[in-house]
Amino acid sequence: MALSKAEILDAIAGMTVLELSELIKEMEEKFGVSAAAVAVAAPAGGAAAGEGAAAVEEQTEFDVILTAAGANKVNTIKVVRAITGLGLKEAKDLVDGAPKPVKEGVAKAEAESVKAQLVEAGAEAEIK
């Protein structure tokens, strides 16, 4: 007897996250596919359409740039170490060499969080 789509969905809804992860792995192996997200390409158009699409396209990766260490350089170094996982000397060199990127290619929410942490420590930072 074949299961209906509704029965399959109900069974999946009752699974734990671990069970779902294992199910996905087994499906990938059985069907020879990958569950990785696929980027959808924009439709090709004339030059004017391409320029319009580029202007509307939202930036998805951001860089957080430390522009100045601020008055309390020690706190800034501590925050940079916490954010980047760098050693003391590397974090100090980064802070002393400002403006320098602290995090590159991160999501907007993470970039804003990193900037807020740096500003809270007394540093100046910007998101590009």
Curated annotation (Swiss-Prot):
InterPro entries: Ribosomal_bL12, Ribosomal_bL12_C, Ribosomal_bL12_C/ClpS-like, Ribosomal_bL12_oligo, Ribosomal_bL12_oligo_N_sf. Keywords: Ribonucleoprotein, Ribosomal protein. GO terms for cellular component: cytosolic large ribosomal subunit. It comes from the Bacteria. It holds the Pfam family Ribosomal_L12_N. GO terms for biological process: translation. GO terms for molecular function: mRNA binding; structural constituent of ribosome. The keyword Chloroplast does not apply. Belongs to the bacterial ribosomal protein bL12 family. Forms part of the ribosomal stalk which helps the ribosome interact with GTP-bound translation factors. Is thus essential for accurate translation. This is Large ribosomal subunit protein bL12.
